[in-house]
Amino acid sequence: MFNRFNKLQAALALVLYSQSALGQYYTNSSSIASNSSTAVSSTSSGSVSISSSIELTSSTSDVSSSLTELTSSSTEVSSSIAPSTSSSEVSSSITSSGSSVSGSSSITSSGSSVSSSSSATESGSSASGSSSATESGSSVSGSSTSITSGSSSATESGSSVSGSTSATESGSSASGSSSATESGSSASGSSSATESGSSVSGSSSATESGSSVSGSSSATESGSASSVPSSSGSVTESGSSSSASESSITQSGTASGSSASSTSGSVTQSGSSVSGSSASSAPGISSSIPQSTSSASTASGSITSGTLSSITSSASSATATASNSLSSSDGTIYLPSTTISGDITLTGSVIATEAVEVAAGGKLTLLDGDKYVFSADFIIHGGVFVEKSKPTYPGTEFDISGENFDVSGTFNAEEPAASSASAYSFTPGSFDNSGDISLSLSESTKGEVTFSPYSNSGAFSFSNAILNGGSVSGLQRRAESGSVNNGEINLENGSTYVVVEPVSGSGTINIISGNLYLHYPDTFTGQTVVFKGEGVLAVDPTETNTTPIPVVGYTGENQIAITADVTALSYDSATGVLTATQGNSQFSFSIGTGFSSSGFNVSEGTFAGAYAYYLNYGGVVASSATPSSTSTTSGATNSTSGSTSFGASVTGSTASTSFGASVTGSTASTLISGSPSVYTTTLTYATTTSTVVVSCSETTDSNGNVYTITTTVPCSSTTATITSCDETGCHVTTSTGTVATETVSSKSYTTVTVTHCDNNGCNTKTVTSECPEETSATTTSPKSYTTVTVTHCDDNGCNTKTVTSEAPEATTTTVSPKTYTTATVTQCDDNGCSTKTVTSEAPKETSETSETSAAPKTYTTATVTQCDDNGCNVKIITSQIPEATSTVTATSASPKSYTTVTSEGSKATSLTTAISKASSAISTYSKSAAPIKTSTGIIVQSEGIAAGLNANTLNALVGIFVLAFFN
């Protein structure tokens, strides 16, 4: 029995031993003492898969670890890092030395100078990335290795390594980056790793080491490549306690004096190149060209098509190094597919056959070029500026003919001093402007602008855009389909907009000091013409416009012209519509009520080289120059719901933002606005100044009526409800315009009716002339004429003729406008007598006066009968009598008065000429860290052994136990 008990005891001991062995295989735990020092070594000589046993150190605040890498061709270099004092995590440094493994080069800055290190890799890592560099004391693991293309570049802390493509300033951190901070100790002050001059394929990373970095989540790569999102590389900061230690973080910096691109997937090349290994980028690899503060050419070498993805620059605008690097032998810049997010200046002519985009905040300055061609997409969300730095230059040829020309930012060209005509051609497949396009072209010889059909919800501004010599000029659209204008078009400094095809929408055309020429007025719909100064609205008599064209600010000084003989002119005082008739065609303009019907007249002249009839007004200027048409809404929709009645239809404003029939309620109710988008502008109409809403969101009045206020414009002749909005909502005030007329010009005009007779009969025409500017004293006198009837008899009989002679000049002191004297002259000849009216121009004067002139020459007629052998003939002899004095009164027409309408609206622009700082853009690619599995290879083998023991060994042990028990 005792023997059996001994056997049973031995069997139980065997079972317990087996169970202990199985438990060891099934658990993956290891017990590591706190505050221990662990050394980890790995080899990487030619190894594709490296098995390394890396023990997990418990997280404590004072752990110092040393990581040593042994390579095939260099001595061991190890360094230990002082513990971090500012973080509970342990900051460690990975020291690297030796030669490149599998062609990958990771740039590592070490606390101590690593001499002759042309390429360094992180210890604990291999080219295959199968093992991970573990930060001692950190909970972050599994960081993938850094794999870069094989260019020999390295940076020693505090010094420039021979053969390096760029020198990193030790201790400097990238501008705008989340700077690598030294914690606890300063390791040679190196806080940035530079990878430059290399073309990245697959992935790239740089590891900062040699400094104790605590809490920093970025490695600053000055002029280095950011990791491609699909690559496995990462920017890892050794000693970082951040879980983002595997993140790919790229930031532009100021190291080496260059600013790098922050665009993901771009390769930034520094000011110098290494053995030509990085001078060109292979097709399909995106690269960037930085605008460097240094004078070195950026990305010197060949830039092949399709390799350029972005052009950036530092915040401080530098010289056009990009243009040098992109220039051809003839000085022309051939721009590949490009996105511009910084401040770039290209000097010289530019040809772009691939898409070019200026991102929001980006700025592209085209300087001193004679020719610009954009034959692919041209997208402008930022700003494009055409500028000249020379005192003399020829006019620019600018051609945009790609598929899309989309402007939501600013396009501005300034070249008024050009010695030859500027020529801008905007003929893309799709032309959409929601921003601001402004062209100030050649002044000496007016510039030409050609447009394809456009969609405009922003602003066009043209100065000096016209052709001389009477040909069709200005902004011309040559296409079958029409344009849509829901914004503003401003014409000044003699600019003429020739509208050949249909224009629709609800926009405004402001004639500031230019002209608008409509060839087909019936297809010019929904637009409001606003006179803001002197100019002409001209219409071709090709068709009758069924809807009157709304015209704001017509005074007669700014004229309406018809390029055909006008046979009748009428004004409806009830509707405010002025109608000109030419044959069977009629042309009507809604100029507003308040004009005098007797003040209108027609005069002849020329416009754009063609004979034209001007519709003039010489009466009192209407107190309201607003059109009565309801088709004057501009820029935005005015909507009402329910049966709301409106007491004032406020239409046709002078606001620079938008014009139109802004609807206001007839009841003085308080408007409640929800989340308004508001800004106000001050409108000046004659002497009435009002602050009105330019933009206000959906509004509900006290009666429950919901409508949208977009622009409210006061009418000077009616009581209008003007709504203003601020942070507290929308409010109602009432303003009544009181100005009837205001003379703002010293110019005056004299109108004379002239009757001209010829073989076809007599025609009566009205001639209007401009009086000279007022002077204080002018000595002059009108010419006067005396008419005498003379009867002349000869062998053929007697004829009566009328002789008109000029009276001598008289002298008087007067200030008067130009005047005219009309005399009726009867002329008789062999065919009979005809009566003609002769009108002559009086000298200048500026006020009404009565003048005393010397008497005109007069004649005495005597009848003489002469007889000879043939008989008697009766002849009449006329002789001059002495001069007498007479009084001639010259009365000038009363000068015209005008009302000037000015407005000054505030203009909100969200994207103008903002300069993008390259350091402000940070692209981050991160992936979550996974817990470390220790002894990974052993676990796989252990689980295999345990699986076998589970079935076989356990059965054998049970059998031994039974035998021992029964024996």
Curated annotation (Swiss-Prot):
It comes from the Eukaryota. Pfam families: Hyphal_reg_CWP (PF11765). GO terms for cellular component: cell periphery; extracellular region; fungal-type cell wall; side of membrane. It is found in: Secreted, Cell wall; Membrane. A lipid is attached at residue 946 (GPI-anchor amidated alanine). The number of the intragenic tandem repeats varies between different S.cerevisiae strains. This is Haze protective factor 1.
